[in-house]
Every structure is written in C-alpha cells, then in structure tokens.
Curated annotation (Swiss-Prot):
This is DNA repair endonuclease XPF. CDD domains: XPF_nuclease_XPF_euk. It comes from the Eukaryota. It comes from Cricetulus griseus. PANTHER family: DNA REPAIR ENDONUCLEASE XPF (PTHR10150:SF0).
Length: 913
C-alpha cells in the first residue's frame, strides 16, 4: 500500500551536483542559462519557484504554457508548499488583479495581461522581487516579453532577471543572436552547460545507466525503398538549387533534409519571395515534404500503412503538383514495386505475361498472394521483452520484478505496438490489411490458406528469411500464456482502461478500431489519468507488485510532462526506446543519476545504417556545434557595464527617437526644445497580442490601453486607425466585416484610416505575377479595396512593410496634433447616437437613402443637402431630382421607385413570370 502511495505522490528529485553549482552561480548574479536538451532547464526553473513561494516575494514567470504551470503547481503541492503559485488569466477582473499582486508569491500571467497592467500601473512595479523567463531564446526585441522586461527595468532597478532555455540550436541563426537576446533580457552573464561540460560529464558518467544498443537490420525491401527515396530526394534538391541559385547550398544538403527543422529552413528562405516563385519551385517544396514523410513512415509504421500512403499519393495527383516529374524516375518505380512486394506478390506466371497487363483490376486481385512483411523492430522488441520476462522470474535479489516502460515516437506507433503485442504480427497486419484494402477479400483467403499449410510451403511462398518466420513464431509463442495471465498489467494499463478483460470478440473489435484510429486514441494524457485512477483503490495497489508494462509516446501529448510523470511514478527498471529521441535520452540520464543505487537498463532499438540513425546523430552534432559557437561568442563578447539597466545610463531603456544630427528649427524660439504635452495613443486591448504597441512605446509615445468598439488605434481626436494583417484583410473583405468597420470609422471620425500591415518575411502580392486584368472581379482583393475606397471617399489606406515602419508612421502622423481622449474613444460605439459636430446627418436615414435605386456615395450628400426628410424627397418631381443628382438615369430610377404603386409592381412581376 505504501508503495502505491509513493508512486502517485512522487516529488521532483533533488538537484544534482552540477545543478547545485549552477544554481549558486545564478543566485549570485543574474544571467541567461543555456543548457543541453533534456538536462533539466525545467528543474532549474522549478528550484527558483520553490525558493520564492513566499508572501514576502513577488516573482513573475514569463513564457510558460498552462500545462507546464499546472505541473509546477502540482509538484510544489506534493512537497507541501503552503503559498502555491497563482495564475492570472482573463477570468480575474482588472480591478481585482492589484490585490492578487500585492499578496505576493509566484505569479503565472499571460504576456498581454502583464503589459496592460504595467502600462496602467495596476501592478506594483517597485514591489516586484524579480522575473523568471522560460524559453529565453524566443525573446526578440519586438515580442511582448521583451516589452514587459523593458517596462520592469524602467520602473524597478533592484529586481532580478533570470532566464532559462535548453535550445542552443536556436542561437545558431542570425547575427549575434545570443547577444541580442541578452540585451533584451537586460543580463550580463551567459551560463553555458552543454552535455560535454566537465562537471556534467563527470557526474553523469559516475551514475550512467546500463545501455543495450540493438542495431536492427532493415529488410532488403525496406533498404531498397529507403535508397529510392533518398535518390528522389537528392534529385529534387538539385533541381531546387537550379531554380533558386540564391539559396544557401549548405542548408540544402541531403543530411539536413533528413532533420526535423528542414521544412522551416526552406520556408525561411522562400517565404519572402513565395508569391514570385514559379509553379515548379512550389511543387518541389511540396515534394520534399512528402518524401520526408515517406521516410518517416517507412521506419515508423508497418508495410500496409506505408503502401496505403504511397497508393493514395499516386491516386491524388494534385498532391505532387502539375509539373512534378519524380514519379517517372526509375527510383520511383523501384519504390512502388518494393512497397507492394512487402504486402503481396503476384505469381511469376502472371508477371511473365506482359500482354495481359491490361486486364481488369479484379482479375489481378484474385491471384495476389499476401506476404505482409513484419516490421523488424517488432521482432527485436519481442526478444527484448522475452529477455526482461526471464530476468523478472529471477529478480528476488533486486526486490521483485521490475517495471517496463516502452517509449515510441507518437500515439499511432504506440497503438500499433499495443496491437502487435496483443495479437501478434500476422493477425494485426491481416486485420489492418482488411480494413485498408477491403476489396482484396480473395487475396486474404489465399494468404490464410497459405498460413494453414506446412512450414516449408510457407517459406517457399515468401521471400523472407527463415529466421524471420522463426522470430514470428517465437514472438507469438512468447505472448501466448503470459498475455492472458497479465492482460490487466500490460495492455489495459497501456491504453488507460480499468475494465475487466474483454471477451475475444469484443477484444478483436476494439483492436480493429484502435489499429487505424486517429492519434488521439492513445494519448499520453489519457493514459496518465487512467493510471492515477487505477492506483486510487486498494485492490489496484497490488498491481505494482507484478511486472507493469506501459507504452508511452515521446512527443505529441497535450501534457508535455506526461512522460516525466510516468517515469517518476512507475519507476521502471527497464526502459525500451523503440524510437530515438535526444531529449528523453538525457532525461533518462538525469533520472538514473537522481536514484543512486537503483538499477536502470535502457534498450536502444535503432535501424542500423538508416535515416533514423542519421537523424539522431545529426541532432547530436548540430547541438554540439551550436554550443561550440556559443562558447566562441562568449569569449569574444563585449558586454557594457550598464547592460542590466540598474541605472539610467542604459540606452535601451531610453524612449524616443530624437537624433543629435536632426536639424533644429531656429525660427521657433531660436531652436530651443519645445516642452509640450507627452504624446499618447489610445490602443484597443486586443491589439496587445501584436508587437506594434511595444514599438510605439519604444518611440516615446505613451499608450492608453482601453476597450474600443470602433477602431484599433486612436492617434488624434479626428484620426482613427483600423489595423489589418494581410490574412485578416482578406477574411474581413470576404465576410463584409471590414465594410462595417469602415462605416463606423467614417461616421464618427473625420479621418478614418485602414492600415494594411504585412510581414517582410512573408509573401504578399495584390496581383498574380505576370498578369493584370483591367476588368474588376468580385473575388479579387484589389477590386474589393477599390470598391471600399469608392464607397468611403474619406477613407485612407496606409501600407506598412513591418511593425517598425508602422510605429514610425504613427509618430509622424501625430506631430503637432492634439492628443486623443481615452474616455471619449471608449464612449463611441457602433450603436452610439452621439456624433461629432462635423457630421450633420443622422446615420439611420442616411443608410436608408443609400439603399434606394439611383443613390450612391457620390450623390447621397448632395441629395441630403437639398432635402430635409423622406416626405420631402417623395414630393419632388423627376426634373428636380435630375438637377439635384446630376444624372437623368439615376433620377428616373429613384422617381419610379418612389411613385410606382405596389399593385403595379406585383402585376408586373406576374406578367414577367
């Protein structure tokens, strides 16, 4: 019973020796900590949270996710901390947030809320003890977190700033990236802790786990497919270089193409000119993505799933683009032939008759013989589990059987492993084949009959090695009796179900459903919740006395700490890494070092000489090179004394853009500086999700955050700005929302402005490349903008290439202009009856008149200047309307509309019918 309770309520392990050394250095001086992936950046952050969980402190935490905040709070609760961290969200009203801050402790708050509270002085800046920043590599100049840190340093010179990140590769891009991040963080010290650090390496080597590397050989068909995909990938890369010579040749190597960040690298180079690229280049980028997916499916999933993906890609030609030619390469033919050979084979007699290749598909399917090649890793996993089971039978010296944790890359792989361990490879693949290719029922019968035959006949019918057949038999034999005896201890725990073992029919239906279900079916979060549920009853605690096997995904869980929880709650003695993942490998090293004296064996399954192995080694190499570059930058880095901003000498804290080279106007008071009112802009609360308010504040303009119904930025009492990104602009034009917004701005402000802001790093073009049509189209963005400006003559369009340019433009528009009033801006709503004095028309009748035939935005004001109300309008003659509107056709339409009898309209409609 005690053992079960300790498994559930397991606190985070104490700091290791090198971690304590780093904490002492960080306590002595603020700085940025860059450690290797998996070496415990979250553990360091948790320790500082633990130190400041006291009402006498007020510490803000930036850049954390809700799941991470929940994990930290639960860990502190387990340790018995009384003053737990609190989360400030939109559910807490703005008036009550000041009380939350003054109660002290740790505060998790969104960046938007903190920015608004700093600007409105709702947070006691002078009482803040310090700020902890997580994922510090994301702190660029224009982001919200950098804005918060700048506001904090302007108002508080004593508080600490400590930043943590485990992504050293992120600092490998751009010029002096780490120095710019430290500048935005206001820290002087850089703490680098790679895996090859002397203190880290020496300590972990003393407590390293027992590692068993198993290099699994791919089948000949898999090797042929991998070679074919790599050849096609290399050909596509060469063609991409030919079409785009400006691309970096080093980044477009075949080795980099195997890594996870390759898609981001390609888009980083091509996004700024994406709208200028031809169809061939865009098609090649899509092909590279598909080929990388094929490589992943080859090593990750079974032969049926891989063939299904290939066939679906060939059937859907639009996936490859119009000009893709790699489908006609010899390597592509080899890939399709070998992929089909892994699933089924056609008798040689059939293949030799080339004249009959045009027969119907049904005739071919009747003579297919299923092969259903098993994944080699499955058999290796069965051997590992068999070895663990044998050791557990003789584990009295170690205190009983050890628990087993199997880690695969994603939920889908976990589901397949569970079904394989439940039913065996043959039954699982046959069931999956039936579900995927339902029309091949006759081929299934042939395969089933072959399996019922004798052993030699099976060997001759299949091209696989006899060793593979024996391994399959061993795997199915191994899973025979123990599978039934320990079903509750393995499979139900894997899927997180606390039900009775189902009957055979129900179990088969469930396995069929899970085999091809969506990845959400085996989520780590569901598994963990069910694991806690199983431990909640007294009878369930006894489960831990028997070998427990859990299959868990490495990535893709909604809870990023689900695997960490399972690791510390189950405390497995054996961990099987079905897929290689650098972060979790390091996490296992920390786990072993924090439990001295307790055995841990790690089985490392990997395809030898495969792209999977190459990806893992490339990730190791890139991280090592990134740390070496950071070490060189740190050695040559020049950090000014005022970097931390603890006095007024730091220029980064200065606001305004007045240059010493700017000429003074000597006609006004001899060039003396004019001490006028401080410029300000009223900003809508929702705009604080963007980086523009930060840049406006940086230019010396005060920001008043309020909730606006009309406009996003009020620059002057007469000038209102509605900001739109390109995607938002297109969506608002299509939905008609932009028309309503422009109507409201035109009605209540003399100078309405539509600001279209596009990112310089993203593609944007109003007209397609090489084509421009004179005729207007209802679906064209340019046409819709033209109609918008025709309908609202006072509306002005501003085009800005970046938020920095927008902030500069706002500053120029505000020069020598009166400041807006926040209360007045808040009082203006879309349904407000109060109008500026310059507008002398009621909006209701004006909208009504605009909907009449013959009335448009050009002649509407002329008509309203001559007519007081609708009754007077109805009394005018057609000649008088012609003189007012200036157009006989419009006057006739309006006159007929006003004076035609309803009965005539109805009768006329019947005649037309």
């Amino acid at each position: 019973m005690d053992r079960g309770i300790s498994a559930v309520r397991k606190a985070m392990a104490p700091l290791l020796e090198y971690e304590r050394q780093l904490v002492l250095e960080l306590l002595d001086s603020d700085g940025l900590v860059v450690c290797a992936r998996g070496l415990g950046a979250d553990r360091l952050l948790y320790h500082f949270l633990r130190l400041h969980c006291h009402p006498a402190c007020l510490v803000l935490v930036l850049n954390t996710q809700p799941a991470e905040e929940e994990y930290f709070i639960n860990q502190l609760k387990i340790e018995g901390v009384e003053h737990l961290p609190r989360r400030v969200t939109n559910e807490i009203t703005s008036n009550s947030r000041y009380e939350v801050y003054t109660q002290g402790g740790i505060i998790f708050a969104t960046s938007r809320i903190l920015v608004v509270d700093f600007l409105t002085d709702r947070i006691p800046s002078d009482l803040i003890t310090g700020i902890l920043v997580y994922r510090a590599h994301r702190i660029i100049e224009s982001c919200q977190e950098a804005f918060i840190l700048r506001l904090f340093r302007q108002k508080n010179k004593r508080g600490f700033i400590k930043a943590f990140t485990d992504n050293a590769v992120a600092f490998d891009t751009g010029f002096c990236h780490v120095e710019r991040v430290m500048r935005n963080l206001f820290v002087r010290k850089l703490y680098l802790w790679p895996r090859f650090h002397v203190a880290v390496n020496s300590f972990l080597e003393q407590h390293k786990p027992e590692v068993v590397e198993i290099h699994v050989s791919m089948t000949p068909a898999m090797l042929s497919i991998q070679t074919a995909i790599l050849d096609i990938l290399n050909a596509c890369l060469k063609e991409l270089k030919c079409h785009n010579p400006s691309l970096e040749v080093e980044d477009l190597s075949l080795e980099n193409a195997l890594g996870k960040p390759f898609d981001k690298t390609i888009r980083h180079y091509l996004d700024p000119l994406w709208h200028q690229l031809g169809a061939k280049t865009k098609s090649l980028v899509q092909d590279l993505k598909i080929l990388r997916t094929l490589l992943q499916y080859l090593s990750q999933y079974d032969c049926v799933t891989f063939l299904n993906l290939l066939e679906s890609l060939r059937a859907t030609e639009k996936v490859f683009g119009q000009n893709s030619g790699w489908l006609f390469l010899d390597a592509s033919t080899s890939m399709f032939v070998n992929a089909r050979a892994r699933v089924y084979r056609v008798p040689d007699v059939k293949l030799n008759k080339k004249a009959k290749m045009s027969e119907s598909a049904e005739g071919q399917e009747t003579k297919k013989e299923l092969v259903l090649e098993s994944n080699p890793k499955w058999e290796a996993l069965s051997e590992v589990l068999k070895e663990i089971e044998a050791e557990n039978k003789e584990s009295e010296a170690l205190g009983g059987p050890g628990q087993v944790l199997i880690c695969a890359s994603d939920d889908r792989t976990c589901c397949q492993l569970r079904d394989y361990l439940t039913a065996g490879a043959e039954a699982f693949l046959l069931r999956l084949y039936r579900k995927t290719f339902e029309k091949d029922s006759k081929a299934e019968e042939v395969w089933v009959n072959l399996r019922k035959g004798d052993g030699p006949k099976r060997t001759m019918k299949s091209d696989k090695r006899p060793k593979d057949t024996k391994n399959k038999e061993r795997a199915s034999t191994k899973k025979g009796a123990p599978k039934r005896k320990k079903r509750e201890l393995t499979l139900t725990q894997v899927m997180g179900t606390a039900e009775e073992p189902p009957e055979e029919g129900a179990a088969e239906e469930d396995q069929q459903r899970q085999a091809t279900s969506s990845p959400e079916g085996c989520g780590g979060e569901i598994q963990h919740e069910a694991f806690d549920l199983n431990l909640s009853s007294d009878s369930a605690y006894g489960i831990l006395k028997e070998p427990l096997t859990i299959i868990h995904p490495l990535v893709g869980c909604s809870d990023p700490y689900a695997l960490t929880r399972v690791l510390h709650e189950v405390e497995p003695r054996y961990v099987v890494l079905y897929d290689a993942e650098l972060t979790f490998v390091r996490q296992l090293e920390i786990y072993r070092a924090s439990r001295p004296g307790k055995p841990l064996r790690v089985y490392f399954l990997i395809y030898g000489g495969s792209t999977e192995e190459q990806r893992y080694l490339t990730a190791l190499r890139k991280e090592k090179e990134a740390f070496e570059k950071l070490i060189r930058e740190k050695a040559s880095m020049v950090v000014p004394e005022e970097r931390e901003g603890r006095d007024e000498t730091n220029l980064d804290l200065a606001r305004g853009t007045v240059s010493t080279d700017a000429p003074a106007d000597t006609r006004k008071a001899g060039g003396q500086e004019h001490n006028g009112t401080q410029p300000s802009i009223v900003v809508d609360m929702r705009e604080f999700r963007s980086e523009l308010p930060s840049l406006i504040h940086r230019r010396g303009i005060d920001i008043e955050p309020v909730t606006l119904e009309v406009g996003d930025y009020i620059l002057t009492p007469e000038l209102c700005v509605e900001r739109k990104s390109v995607s938002d602009l297109i969506g608002s034009l299509n939905s008609g929302r932009l028309y309503s917004q422009c109507l409201a701005m035109s009605r209540y402000y003399r100078r309405p402005v539509l600001l279209i802001e596009f990112d310089a790093g993203k593609p944007f073009s109003l007209a397609p490349r090489g084509s421009f049509f004179q005729e207007m189209s209802s679906s064209d963005v340019s046409s819709k903008l033209t109609l918008l400006t025709l309908h609202f003559p006072r509306l002005r369009l501003l085009w800005c290439p970046s938020p920095h340019a927008t902030a500069e433009l706002f500053e120029e528009l505000k020069q020598n202009k009166p400041q807006p009033d926040a209360a007045t801006a808040m009082a203006i709503t879309a349904d407000s009856e109060t109008l500026p004095e310059s507008d002398k028309y009621n909006p209701g009748p004006q909208d009504f008149v605009l909907k009449m035939p013959g009335i448009n935005a050009k002649n509407c004001h002329s008509l309203m200047n001559h007519v007081k109300n609708i009754a007077e309008l109805a009394s005018l003659s057609q000649e008088r309307l012609t003189s007012i509107l200036g157009h006989a056709g419009n006057a006739k339409q309006l006159y007929d509309f006003l004076h035609t009898a309803y009965a005539d309209v109805v009768s006329g409609g019947r005649v037309r019918k």
